Amino acid sequence: MKLLGLVFLLFNLFMFSFSRKLLTESGGGLHDEAALLKLKSSFLDPNGVLSSWVSDSSSNHCSWYGVSCNSDSRVVSLILRGCDELEGSGVLHLPDLSSCSSSKRRLGGVISPVVGDLSEIRVLSLSFNDLRGEIPKEIWGLEKLEILDLKGNNFIGGIRVVDNVVLRKLMSFEDEDEIGPSSADDDSPGKSGLYPIEIASIVSASVIVFVLLVLVILFIYTRKWKRNSQVQVDEIKEIKVFVDIGIPLTYEIIVRATGYFSNSNCIGHGGFGSTYKAEVSPTNVFAVKRLSVGRFQGDQQFHAEISALEMVRHPNLVMLIGYHASETEMFLIYNYLSGGNLQDFIKERSKAAIEWKVLHKIALDVARALSYLHEQCSPKVLHRDIKPSNILLDNNYNAYLSDFGLSKLLGTSQSHVTTGVAGTFGYVAPEYAMTCRVSEKADVYSYGIVLLELISDKRALDPSFSSHENGFNIVSWAHMMLSQGKAKEVFTTGLWETGPPDDLVEVLHLALKCTVDSLSIRPTMKQAVRLLKRIQPSRL
């Protein structure tokens, strides 16, 4: 049976009933490199996907394709993208493995009890496969397991209540008959021990309690509404201004300038809302981002977020001039940039060759903005949605990062935060998409994707990639071109001839380093700025 995609991320979690004889572990002291080599030896690899998995003095296993390690060189993640041709079976002992996902991969067989050896596993997703048999009790001994997704399989029985097991997110069976105890035989009065009059009394009491509870809630809500109604009338038209622009800004002036948020003045749509051009006067033009009120738990949270960002100022960040917030309307007021966004710039540059110094300037400006958010803001600011449409340009090709104002803020003692996945498909870092754990290295990954788009004629998920296997993106394409000795063909038309080839290749390698799976290998944005400044064109 040919196993698609990431089948062998599952290691020793299960054995296929029709697979070959599994390899055995050589002992408790088996090193990760030896374990990976054993895994490779059990595969049929006609396309040489694992050709870099060779034990020699020039590199260690942490640099092999698809392998990510921690600071102790222990394997913590294995993502084999584009490995549809791998075939075989194997057992691998990786005690530090923390994340394993293989959904919709046509996996069969049973889950082996040796799953209990993965003491560091946090995410285990085996949904929509063809797994059978019973779920081994060893799974419930995995103390660090946070996410378990087994739905869409053919297991016997269902999930039982297990003592001392606390999962942050448990997704188990769909369309199963044995989730929880059956109640088919427990509905008769005889077995319940209750007479009809007793049942009627209980139901009546429950209804009375429910009605009283609703009345109390309505009473409290009504009092709160009356107490705040006058305040709302006074505040509904207020605009908080951070920057003195020489003219008064009122709610009526801004809303009228947007044409009352008419479609003709709409200049962009994003995850937080739509942006409108507001021309108050010929010399005072603003961009007004109208937010979806439901994204915030009331205007108090909104005020808290904005007040924390009031001092976030950098030459390459779009300037926040002011805002309005009430229970029915929220919008931010930014300076308007007439050069459009980077997404449109990339689409339209085919009409004329773009000089290397212009592309370099844009790349450096964005890197500086991100470095400021990550390194100089306290608490640090994570953007979480770096993409070309969130990078604005003026008429001199100066680049400005937008939409940072509503990203999550981290305390100084935190290096990451667990939250729902924000961002745009194609730009989201793989570890963020898989575990919802985001750090500044997720922004670095997104920056690498944007950098590849900036220097090439490809999009993150270019239509031309459809002929390749699932998961093939601009990173896969750039690696493929390099491996075939076609680095020159990565760059947009005319760029190789006008830009110094050595500098262009350095930027290409920077983009690929920003998009590696291993967080420890990805550079910081401060390091990216340092490299870009070193190869800065002499004439700007």
UniProtKB/Swiss-Prot annotation:
Alphabetical list of SMART domains matching this protein: S_TKc
Gene Ontology terms: cellular component: peroxisome; plasma membrane
Swiss-Prot/TrEMBL induction comment: By ABA (at protein level), dehydration, high salt levels, and low temperature.
Tissue: Expressed in roots, stems, leaves, and flowers.
Subcellular location: Cell membrane
Chief location bin: membrane
Lipid bilayer topology: Single-pass type I membrane protein
Post-translational modification Phosphothreonine, affected residues: 250, 258, 435
Deleted gene: phenotype: Decreased sensitivity to ABA during germination, growth, and stomatal closure. Impaired central domain protoderm patterning defects, and defective cotyledon primordia cell types.
LRR repeats: 118-142, 144-169
Entry-linked InterPro entries: Kinase-like_dom_sf, Leu-rich_rpt, LRR_dom_sf, LRR_N_plant-typ, LRR_Rcpt-Like_S/T_Kinase, Prot_kinase_dom, Protein_kinase_ATP_BS, Ser/Thr_kinase_AS
Residues passing through the membrane, by range: 199-219
Limits of the Protein kinase domain: 261-535
Keyword match Transferase: yes
GO biological process: abscisic acid-activated signaling pathway; embryonic meristem development; longitudinal axis specification; radial axis specification; response to abscisic acid; response to cold; response to salt stress; response to water deprivation
One function term, GO molecular function aspect: protein serine/threonine kinase activity
Residues reported in the UniProt entry to bind ATP: 267-275, 289
Keywords: Abscisic acid signaling pathway, ATP-binding, Cell membrane, Developmental protein, Kinase, Leucine-rich repeat, Membrane, Nucleotide-binding, Phosphoprotein, Receptor, Repeat, Serine/threonine-protein kinase, Signal, Transferase, Transmembrane, Transmembrane helix
Function: Involved in the main abscisic acid-mediated (ABA) signaling pathway and in early ABA perception. Together with RPK2, required for pattern formation along the radial axis (e.g. the apical embryonic domain cell types that generate cotyledon primordia), and the apical-basal axis (e.g. differentiation of the basal pole during early embryogenesis).
Protein name: Probable LRR receptor-like serine/threonine-protein kinase RPK1
